[in-house]
Amino acid sequence: DNPIVKGCIKAAPGHKIVAMDLTTAEVYVAAVLADDKNLMKVFQDGGNFHSNIAKLVFNLPCEAEDVAEHYPTDRQAAKAVTFGIMYGAGANKISQQVSTDSGTFFSKTQAQEVIDDYFKQFHKLKKWIDLSSKFIMDNGFIYGATGRKRRLPNVKSDNQGIQSHEVRSGMNFLVQSVA
């Protein structure tokens, strides 16, 4: 979005330059892999993704385009949960992220409530995450959508931090091998 950079780039006659925001591409891939129609619909409806999520999760009494102005902390919480759950963040991490990004204290309890509300809306995503994580824990590997196998041998470690890292790596692999 830098105007100086944009001014340096010109399309050839008869052509157009298209800019794309792919920051939510991995979330869409997860929605498709989980077959979560509710989450896919948020993408299909267009508009600002995180505002749409916040309106849906918090049942906000405004139009999605007004969420950022009237409910900035809720929007930030929805954004933090959307990206956080993709990478294994729990209530503590999401609490810290929302507090930092919004400049407003957001407790661990509030974060857990948002996570719970998020998964009420997107229950198929939750089921997919749970089943995939269990498969990784049980087998020490996971197959991506294209059939590629990712070995995660340290998932059987006695160290909980190492186990969690392996599960996160496996979940990241599932999404990033397609995105």
Regions found by a protein language model. Give the residues of each.
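Conserved catalytic core of nucleotide polymerization and phosphodiester-bond processing enzymes
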Residues: D1-A179
